[in-house]
Each structure stands twice: as C-alpha cells, then as structure tokens.
Amino acid sequence: MINYVYGEQLYQEFVSFRDLFLKKAVARAQHVDAASDGRPVRPVVVLPFKETDSIQAEIDKWTLMARELEQYPDLNIPKTILYPVPNILRGVRKVTTYQTEAVNSVNMTAGRIIHLIDKDIRIQKSAGINEHSAKYIENLEATKELMKQYPEDEKFRMRVHGFSETMLRVHYISSSPNYNDGKSVSYHVLLCGVFICDETLRDGIIINGEFEKAKFSLYDSIEPIICDRWPQAKIYRLADIENVKKQIAITREEKKVKSAASVTRSRKTKKGQPVNDNPESAQ
C-alpha cells in the first residue's frame, strides 16, 4: 500500500529544497534570464572546483527525490516541477552566452482547437459585438472552417514564439569526451540553469547578449496557420511536419551518397585509374 501521507511530506520537502537550490544558484550566477512573469530563470554559474562535489551531491539528491516522487501518481505532480535536473559541465576551456528565440510547443487535435475557438466566440458575442470583436470573430470563424476540413483527431502542433532564452557556445579541452576538434558545442540552458566547473576554464566566460536566429528550421518550408485566438503562435499540421522530416532525411542520404562517390572518384583520379561517371553504361 502506497503511503500518500509520506508522499505529500516528501513533495513539500522537495519543493523547499528545489526552491532554495535555485535561489542560491541565481544569487551567484554570472547570467540569468527573466521569465515572462519576471522570475529569474536559467542561471549560468561558474563553479569553483572545490565546490563541485557538494553541488553534485545536491543535484544527486534532487534526482533521487524526483524519482521517488514519481512513485506517487495520485499526487498528480507535474513533471515540469520535478524535471529537468541541473547539470555541471566539466572539462570546459571557454564558454560564451548568446540569446536565441525560444519556442513552446503543444500538440492539439482539430477537434480541440475547434472547441476552444467556439468557446471564445461565445464569450465575445456575450460581451457585445463592436468593430474590433467582429474582426476577431471573423478570423476565428475562418480558422474554424479550415479545421473542419480535417478529421476531429487530426493532430496539429502549436508553436508559441515571442521570447528569448540563453544558449552557450562551449569549447571543451582536448582530453574531454565532448571535445569537438576545437570547435564550439551548443548547449541549451534549461530553466533550472547550469553550472560550469572552473577547473579547466582558462579562457573564462563571455557574457554576450547578441541574438542569433537559427540558420534553418524544418518549419520554414511549411505554411503555418495563423489565428488571432493565439496571437503569438503558429499552427502546423503534424503530418506536414513528418513529411518534411522524411524529405530532409532523403536529401541527407542523397548527399552522403554523392559525397562518397566524389571521394572515390578523387582517389581513382590520383591513382591514374579510369573514372566511370555513368555506371549504367558498364552494364
């Protein structure tokens, strides 16, 4: 029998522990982001080597408590409270912060979207129609008609834009398993933040506020659905997303084949061997 009284006590202990841990991290951080409600989030902390073991012990405690709380499903604790768990980056030579666009995603069915639109339309009409609300309702009705073209269980992804988050460019030392031939490795700073051990941080940390747009997104090739009900969101059909992913995979494989053929041709040329650019002619 599951002891939910103990589970509730453990949950309260975890929340207090987590909040204090994050508060201390924010207080000593070299950089923090601000959430939409003003809360400090994503602390980036340079950690003295001598404190690494003690912080790791606290992270391990966080992990164990979170896993134990998963054994109490009836408490309905959101996973976003338990996870993610903070991390310590080791073997880092240099790190630079930069900003990128943050996107929150949620999947919904066409039926769910229609339901939410209908609910909003009823609210707008009950409050009285003016010029602004009439245009708003017209936009919602157009989106509703579009959604009615699909089965109710057709899935869509809603991507909410409009805010930024911190990323890191991390250069690891050559003996690190994360070493990337001297090139930087991108690291997404989660809401719980990240610690960077200073043992090998000989080139330090650079706090850079520049905004960097992603070079490519598979969503760039899909026409989104725009609805005034969600002014900062773009809506995509999940089937369209999967089709683009498949096409990207095919293109990637074709490039690999061409690259391999190019290497083979180059080697044969160097050796003075004949090169057949039309293999079918040899059949």
From Swiss-Prot:
Origin: domain of life: Viruses
Query: Which keywords does the record carry?
Result: DNA-binding, Repressor, Transcription, Transcription regulation
For this UniProt entry, which segments traverse the membrane?
A: none
Which intervals of the chain are annotated as region Disordered?
Answer: 254-283
| GO function term, MF aspect, one | DNA binding
Record keyword Transcription regulation present: yes
Question: At which residues is the DNA-binding region annotated?
Answer: 30-49
Which InterPro entries would you find in this protein's record? Lysogenic_reg_DNA-binding (IPR053501), Repressor_C1 (IPR016726)
Q: Changing I55S: reported impact? A: In mutant P1c1.100
> Further notes on this entry?
Thermolability of the mutant P1c1.100 seems to be due to an alteration in the C-terminal half of the repressor.
User: What role does it play?
Assistant: Sequence-specific DNA-binding protein required for the establishment and maintenance of lysogeny. This protein recognizes the sequence 5'-ATTTATTAGAGCA[AT]T-3'. Binding to the operator DNA of c1 repressor is sensitive to N-ethylmaleimide.
Q: What is this protein called?
A: Repressor protein C1
The organism encoding this protein is: Escherichia phage P1
